[in-house]
């Protein structure tokens, strides 16, 4: 099993898609990349902690290649906008990838290079060593599955799921 810690806007969005991805055994929403030793949702949203909203995606490489997990990541958010994803604005929504090993760092950098051709502006995704992963509050775990009718889910997450179905249907569970 391998785990990638990825930030691409609101963690609910990435969580919703990766929860439906073949070979993914766990998705945990959380915070990382900042200086606050005890972040919570409200402090992270204040923009004062330096943390990003992220997901820790654990997957089985025997079922899904790491490159597919990373290419999905770049397809599911706009990695060319600094500190923003759509209406979600602030450093907590930055495009980010946090590595624990040199191998992961190389995979992340290769994914950026591979996906740059798909974008007309430079990718600004931050690639940093994972300092510590802080699990988000239970309310944020598997949010879409618990609240599919909520407005944010309908307007923001559903289009991302549709995009995943269009481009990655072979990798999604029915």
Curated annotation (Swiss-Prot):
Function, as annotated: Has an important function as a repair enzyme for proteins that have been inactivated by oxidation. Catalyzes the reversible oxidation-reduction of methionine sulfoxide in proteins to methionine.
E.C. designation(s): 1.8.4.11
One of the Pfam families matching this protein, by short name: PMSR
GO MF assignments: L-methionine:thioredoxin-disulfide S-oxidoreductase activity; peptide-methionine (S)-S-oxide reductase activity
Family annotation (PANTHER family): PEPTIDE METHIONINE SULFOXIDE REDUCTASE (PTHR43774), PEPTIDE METHIONINE SULFOXIDE REDUCTASE MSRA 2 (PTHR43774:SF1)
The protein's name: Peptide methionine sulfoxide reductase MsrA
Top-level division of the source organism's lineage: Bacteria
InterPro entries: Met_Sox_Rdtase_MsrA_dom (IPR002569), Met_Sox_Rdtase_MsrA_sf (IPR036509)
Active site: 10
Coiled coil: none
Family: Belongs to the MsrA Met sulfoxide reductase family.
UniProt keyword annotations, A-Z: Oxidoreductase
